[in-house]
Amino acid sequence: MANGNFKLSQLLNVDEMSAEQRSHFFDLMLTKPDCEIGQMMQRVVVDKVDDMIRERKTKDPVIVHEVLSQKEQNKLMEIYPEFNIVFKDDKNMVHGFAAAERKLQALLLLDRVPALQEVDDIGGQWSFWVTRGEKRIHSCCPNLDIRDDQREISRQIFLTAIGDQARSGKRQMSENELWMYDQFRKNIAAPNAVRCNNTYQGCTCRGFSDGKKKGAQYAIALHSLYDFKLKDLMATMVEKKTKVVHAAMLFAPESMLVDEGPLPSVDGYYMKKNGKIYFGFEKDPSFSYIHDWEEYKKYLLGKPVSYQGNVFYFEPWQVRGDTMLFSIYRIAGVPRRSLSSQEYYRRIYISRWENMVVVPIFDLVESTRELVKKDLFVEKQFMDKCLDYIARLSDQQLTISNVKSYLSSNNWVLFINGAAVKNKQSVDSRDLQLLAQTLLVKEQVARPVMRELREAILTETKPITSLTDVLGLISRKLWKQFANKIAVGGFVGMVGTLIGFYPKKVLTWAKDTPNGPELCYENSHKTKVIVFLSVVYAIGGITLMRRDIRDGLVKKLCDMFDIKRGAHVLDVENPCRYYEINDFFSSLYSASESGETVLPDLSEVKAKSDKLLQQKKEIADEFLSAKFSNYSGSSVRTSPPSVVGSSRSGLGLLLEDSNVLTQARVGVSRKVDDEEIMEQFLSGLIDTEAEIDEVVSAFSAECERGETSGTKVLCKPLTPPGFENVLPAVKPLVSKGKTVKRVDYFQVMGGERLPKRPVVSGDNSVDARREFLYYLDAERVAQNDEIMSLYRDYSRGVIRTGGQNYPHGLGVWDVEMKNWCIRPVVTEHAYVFQPDKRMDDWSGYLEVAVWERGMLVNDFAVERMSDYVIVCDQTYLCNNRLILDNLSALDLGPVNCSFELVDGVPGCGKSTMIVNSANPCVDVVLSTGRAATDDLIERFASKGFPCKLKRRVKTVDSFLMHCVDGSLTGDVLHFDEALMAHAGMVYFCAQIAGAKRCICQGDQNQISFKPRVSQVDLRFSSLVGKFDIVTEKRETYRSPADVAAVLNKYYTGDVRTHNATANSMTVRKIVSKEQVSLKPGAQYITFLQSEKKELVNLLALRKVAAKVSTVHESQGETFKDVVLVRTKPTDDSIARGREYLIVALSRHTQSLVYETVKEDDVSKEIRESAALTKAALARFFVTETVLXRFRSRFDVFRHHEGPCAVPDSGTITDLEMWYDALFPGNSLRDSSLDGYLVATTDCNLRLDNVTIKSGNWKDKFAEKETFLKPVIRTAMPDKRKTTQLESLLALQKRNQAAPDLQENVHATVLIEETMKKLKSVVYDVGKIRADPIVNRAQMERWWRNQSTAVQAKVVADVRELHEIDYSSYMYMIKSDVKPKTDLTPQFEYSALQTVVYHEKLINSLFGPIFKEINERKLDAMQPHFVFNTRMTSSDLNDRVKFLNTEAAYDFVEIDMSKFDKSANRFHLQLQLEIYRLFGLDEWAAFLWEVSHTQTTVRDIQNGMMAHIWYQQKSGDADTYNANSDRTLCALLSELPLEKAVMVTYGGDDSLIAFPRGTQFVDPCPKLATKWNFECKIFKYDVPMFCGKFLLKTSSCYEFVPDPVKVLTKLGKKSIKDVQHLAEIYISLNDSNRALGNYMVVSKLSESVSDRYLYKGDSVHALCALWKHIKSFTALCTLFRDENDKELNPAKVDWKKAQRAVSNFYDW
C-alpha cells in the first residue's frame, strides 16, 4: 500500500466510520486475520488496491524526485487526484513540497493549451520541460536577482546530471528530450529554442513580424507574475499577439482584510507591511519572497482591464490548496459603447474562516500598562459551548477560575452529543487566558443590562393608581420635550448663544492650560460642544432626552474624541467569508488612449456600411423578384442627421450619442393592392422545407459565383437549431379528392367525454393507427378536463391568490392589468388557455402564447370577454394536438410495408447499424428522442453525406408535425428505438414516408411504450409478434461482464460483451437522500420523477453541476460512469419492474454505483454478479467459449397439524432470544438519546413554503419523568419531545413527501364510473338515504358525547359562519413513534406522526353531519363488505365467521404508503360526490371543498406555518371514514370486487377474499397512475389485516393479533407505574385470548415464519408470551421500577383500571 501511494481512507470509507467501528475494523484485520469477516475485509482491501493500481496505470506517470514525508505525499495526492504521481525520493530540497507542487501545477496549466500549439513559459520551468520532452515550450527565465542566478545554476547542474545519466546508460531519453538536450550542447547558458535568460517582454527568440516581437498565442506563468506589472504584461500580450495567459499564484484573499495569515497547504504564511507583501515558509530560515502589494492586488481582485483597444478578462478557474489557477484572456475588437455602463459583481471566498468567529481579547503592555486589543479567531462550535456554559453559571460561580478551567478542559476535546470530538482549531494557551478574561467581563457586563431590562419592563407594566403618578408623568414628559428640542437644534443654532454663558470658564481653561490657546483654536468645535452639553446638563435635560437622541449624541461625541468604549467592544463577530468586488466596466477606459488607435476611421466605417447595405438591398430585390413576378423594389436613401467631425476621439466619442453608420431602408412599389401582395408573399414564404431549401441554395450559389467582393448570404432558419417548431404547421391536404377542414383540437369544453374505442377491423396496421388516434384524442380530453378543473376552482374562489406551490404549475394572467395574479413556477408555455365567457357553459380556447421576459404580450380576443388567461403543465407543450390534427386527415387503409426488427441487447450497436446501413440521402431515418437524433446526424455528417441531414434525419414528433405533406419519403425507413413508440405511430411513419421496408431497432426486454392516460386500455400498442423478420443481436459493446451476466438471465441466447471490464457494479446503502454522494459532472439516474426532482434540488442546493435523468429518459443513452439512486423506500410496481432494471443496469461502460435506501431486486442482482468469480465472468466475454449451465429448482411444502393444550412454559430469555432471531441487532440499538442528539446538532432540511418563528422555546428536555424499565429489549422507540425541529422533520418526511401524479386522468369520467360501481357493488340502492340532514336529535347526541372542555370552547366562540377561516388548520405532532417490525430502527430516524385538525367550532359544525352520513353508509352497505369502524376484536371476528373453512380462497392484501398525503383534487371531488349521495347539502359541500383545497397549517406550540394542497387532513371531522372511502373506491375501480367473497377495509388497510383461481390484473400500476397511491400487493399463506393474522381454525376464521408486534410493544419505556401496567394487562389479556388455544399457536408459528421469513419454530416463544400475558404477576416480571426493583402486583386499584380501559383502549 505504501508503494502504491494510497491512503487508507481511499481504500475504505474509514473517515465515515465512528471511532468504535474503526477500532473493531483494525482489531479484526490485525488480530483475527483467519476469521471469515477478517478474510472478507482482507479481500476487500486487496480488491480495492488492485482497482486503484489498475486505474492509476491508465494515467501518465508524473515523477516527483523531491524527498517528501508520507503526510506530504498524501496531501499532494489529495490536492491533485488526476495525476499518477510516482515518488522517487532521490532529491533533497529546501522546499520539497512546494517544488513538487509546482510541477503538477505546470502540467495543469499546460493542459489548458491545445496539444499542438506552441507555448511561452513566463519565468520558466525549462529543466522540467526538458525531462518531459516538451519541445513546443519556450521558457523565458530572466535572472533578476541573486536567487534567480542560483536557480539557473541548479537547473544547469540538473541538466548536466541528466546528460551524464544518459551517457552512462542509467537513463533512457526520448527523441524530444534528445533534441532539447542538443540545444544546450554548444553553450548551456546561451539563449536557444528551449529557453533564454530574457524577460518575457524582451524575448526575441521567436523572431519579429512587422517590426514587432513574435510570440506564441498561448503562454503560461507559474508563480512568476508577482513582480510582472500588469500593464507590462498587457503590452507584451498585445505586441506578441498572445491570446491567453494561464497562470498560477499563491492566493490569499484574506490579505485584503488582515495583514498577516497562514498558507496551510504549503506550510507557509503571508505578511503585509510597508506597501509590500511577504511570502515565506513556517519554521524555515531561508529568505522570504517580497512583492509589490499594489501589483499583487490587481491579480488578486482580477478586475477586467482595458489597454490599447483590447479588453483583458480574468477567469479564475480553480483553487488547489493555497494556489489560484486563473487565465487572462485578451479580447480584441470589443465595442466600448456596449461596455461603458455594464456592472459586474463577484465574491472572493475565504474558505479558511469557515465555522470561525472573531473574539476580541485584551492585554496590558508591561512598560506603559496600556490596554491593547487584538482579534482572535476561534472555532464557532467551541465558542458556542463556552458561552453557553458561562451563561448558566450563577453569580457566585461566575469566577475567573471556573471560566479558565472550562476553557482549558475543552480546548483540545469537545464533547458533542455525548461523543468526544477533537477541536481542530485549538487556541494557544497564552491567548486562552486572555480569552477567559474577555468572556468573563462580557458576561459581567451583560447581567446588569438584563436586570435593567427587566426593571424597565416592570416599570412599563406598573399600573397608574393615583393623581400624583399622573402629574409626575405629565411633568416628566414636558421636560423631555424641552430637552429633546434643545438637543436637536443645539448643534446648529443654540451653541453660539449658550457659549456666551460661560466665556470666563473657557478663557480661564485656555489660559491655565499649557498650549491652551492653540488647543482651544484647534478644538474650537469640541469646546463648544462641551459648553453646550454643560448647559443642557445644568437644566436637567440630559436625563430627560429621548433615548435614541441621547444615544446619537453619545455616539457623535465618541467619534469626535476617538473614544471607543461600551459593551460592543466585547462582541463576538463572524469573520468576513468573502471579499466583494462591485465595479463598472466604464472605469476601465483611460482618457489618455487616443481615438485613432482604439476606433477605426469614421469615414472608412461609413463607406463600408453604405456598401454593405447596398449589397443587402440588391440581394433582397433579386430574390423577391425571382420569387414574385409583381414585385419591384427601390432603395430610398436618407442622409445622416449630422456629419461626425474627425476631431472627437477617445472617451469623448464613446460618451456622445451620435449616429455613426448610415441609415437605409427598402421601399416597395406595388402593382396590386396591399392585401393581395401580402397574401401572396406569405403563401410563398410558408412553403415546404424542400422548396425553400432548393431556392435558397440555388440563389446562394449564384450570389457566390457572381459577386466579386466575395459577400456571402446567410439565411437563418425561423426555428433555432435543436428546437422543434411547436406552432401549427400549415400544410396542404394529404387525402385526395376531399376537402378536410381542421377540427378545432385547441378548443376546451367542459363536460367532454373520453372518445369511444374504435371498431376492430382485423388488420393490425389499421387497428393500431386507429388506436393511436384514439389515444391522442383521449389524452387531449383528459388534459382539457384538468385545465377546466383549474379554471372552475379559480373562478369559484376555491383556488385563491396569495398561495404557494399551486397544483399543475398553475399560473393566472390578468389580461387588463397585464400582470400575474398567480405567477407560475416556469414560463414559456407554448399555449395559454383563454376562457370564453360569452356562453353559459364552461369553455375556452388554447391560444399560441407570446412571451417576453416572463410576461405574456398576446393580444387576446376581446369578444370572449375573459379578464384572465391560464397556463399550466397541460399547456406547456401541445405537440400531440398538432400530430392528432395532421394524422386525422390521412386515409387509414392497410399499410403495404414489410417490418423487420433488430432485437438487440443494450449497447449492441443498434444506432451504429443504422449509420452503417442507411443512406440518408434516399432513406428516411427517425428516432424517438432528440439526443439520439442529434447523435445520428453527427455520425452521418462524419461520413460526408452530401444531403441536408437535418431534413432526412428527424425525431418522430417532428416528422409527424411537419412532413405529413409527403416532403420526406423513401423506400426504406430506419426507426431507432421503435418499441418505445406506439405501434400505430410506427405504421403512420411508414405510411407517410411511403416506405416499402421498415427496419426497426429495439429491445423487447427494455421499456416499451407507456401511455400517459391511465384510463385507456390499449390493445394494439406493441409491435412485438407482428414483425416479418426478427434478427437477434446478443453481443454488447457497452456493458461490462457483470452486467452481461445479469442480462443473460432475461434474454434468449447467450449474452456476450466486447467490453474488457469485468466488475463494474457496487451497492452503497444510504439512509436518506442527504447521504447521496454528490460528484461534479457525474451522471445520476433515478427511477421516479419525484426522486429526480429531489436530487436536482439537492444538487442545486449544494451547488454541484451534474446531470440527472430518470431510467425512462436515459434509455438509449450511454455513459461512462453512472450513479443510480433510489431515495424512496416504497416499491413502485411500474418504475421498479424488470424492464426498468435492465435499462438502469446497462447504461454505463465503466462503473455503476447503486445508492439505495432499501434492498431490492436491483441490489440483489448487483450483489449476485459481484459474487461471481473471474472464471464465471470469463464466459460472458466474446472470446470465451460458451459454457453450459444447469440449474435445479425445488418446491418446498410445509404442513403442520395436531392441536393440544398450551403449556405454561417459557422464560423471558426465550422471548428475548426469539426477538433477536427475528430482528438481529435491534435489541442492541439504544434510541433513548436520538431525539436529544437531533435537537442539539445541526440538521439540514429543505422545506418549501414554510415559515418558522425563532424564539426561546421551552426546553422540553429539562422535563424529567419516571417510567417503568422494560426487561425485554426491543426496537420499541422512546417517546420524543415535540420540538420545532421534530415538527419540521415530520412535515418534510410526511406532508411534503407526497407523490405527484405523472399521468393525465379524466377526473370527471373516473368519478362517474366509480360512483356507478359503488351503487351496483357496495351499497344497496334501496337503502340509500339522500334526505337532508336536519336531525336535531343527532346534533344533541354528538354534543353530549363531547367533553366539557370542548363544549366550553365552542360556546365561547361567537363567530358567524362567514367569519370563520375554514382553510386554516392547527398542526401538531405525536410524541409516540410507531414501532416497526423490521431492521430499519437500526439506521433510520423515523419521523413523528402529524395531526392536522380544525378548531373546535368547525368540528362542531361538520361532526354531527358526517356522523349521520357514516351511519347511513353502514346501513346501506352490502353484508360481505366489512368496514372496520367502532369494532372490537370480537366484533370483527363475528363479521368474518360466514367464511367457509372448507372453501378455498385467494386472499389479497394491498399495502399503501403515504396514503392520506397522496390525496389530490380528484379524491376530494369523489369524496364530495359520496357525501352528496347520502344527503350532504351544497353549502356544506362547498365549505368542505374550500377547507381542503388551499390550506394553511399552523403549529402554535413550536412556531411553524406551512401551506398544503388537497391532502386529507389527519385530524378533521371525517378523517378515518374519508380514508376508508378512498381505499374502497380505489380497490373497486381496479379489482373485480363484484367477484369477492369478503372485502374488509378500514383506513388504508384492506383484505379481500376471492374464490380460489380468480383471475385479475395486478392493480398496483393503475393505483399509482390513476389514484396516485404508492402500493404493494401481498399474497401470503396467512393474510393479515390491521395488525392481525386471519387464521383458519377447524371451525371458523379468526383474527389474532400479531405476536411479534405485541412482543415489540412490551419493550415500551413510557409506562408510568403499576396502575398503568394493570390497564395494559386488561387490554392485552382481552385481545390475545386466542393464544390459549394451541391450534392457534401452531398456526401463528407458521404465520410468523411466512411473514417475517423466519426459518425457526416459534411455538416455544408463543407459549412464553401467553404465559406472561395471562397472569398479571408474570407480566410484572417484564418490568422494573425506577430503582430497578421488582414490581408489587398488589398495588393496583382494579376498579379504577377497569374504568380507564374502554373498548378501544390503545396503549
From Swiss-Prot:
Keyword rRNA-binding: no
PROSITE patterns, per database record: ALPHAVIRUS_MT (PS51743), PSRV_HELICASE (PS51657), RDRP_SSRNA_POS (PS50507)
Domain RdRp catalytic residue range list: 1449-1562
Region Methyltransferase, residue ranges: 65-425
UniProt domain (+)RNA virus helicase ATP-binding: residue ranges: 872-1033
Any coiled-coil regions, as ranges: 601-622
Region (Helicase): 901-1155
Residue ranges constituting the Alphavirus-like MT domain according to the UniProt record: 86-300
Classification via InterPro entries: (+)RNA_virus_helicase_core_dom, Alphavirus-like_MT_dom, DNA/RNA_pol_sf, P-loop_NTPase, RNA-dep_RNA_pol_alsuvir, RNA-dir_pol_PSvirus, Virgaviridae_RdRp
Further comment found in the protein's record: The replicase large subunit is translated as a fusion protein by episodic readthrough of a termination codon. When readthrough of the terminator codon TGA occurs between the codons for 1187-Lys and 1189-Arg, this results in the addition of the RdRp region.
Listed name of the protein: Replicase large subunit
Species of provenance: Tobacco rattle virus (strain SYM)
